[in-house]
């Protein structure tokens, strides 16, 4: 499936393309990570090869990243679950492609972006979420993508869970009330 997408997917388009690229892209990139490190090519089995990694990196850089970058560079216009989803995928591409500047861009967005998906804009000091007046489902999505992003960073040795006095935890506590 991943090889098929990497060889045919040329564009992600539509009014929700950043959200699609962030949410669905994250599932694909996680699957690619599993394939890359679990099913290695060997003399007995046609597993995941370096060529497969290069092909999928090309798809993430040339199809997904332009959509994500357009969103990141635009004036904020969406609820925070969009920005969080987009930024999580930017970070994941940075990790998968061993692109430290791209990873650092995602960390900077997490802390400093004007977008509603940055940590200080999505979760207030009280724990209230930017979408708390909307519905629980979108709040769960928004705080969930921030936690997934923090987990990706944790695997790299960066503790974003503790950011801004454990703001993600405060968001979960507020959400659970």
Locate predicted features.
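Aromatic-lined, polymer-binding surfaces characteristic
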Residues: 1-157
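CBM-like carbohydrate-recognition segments
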Residues: 160-177
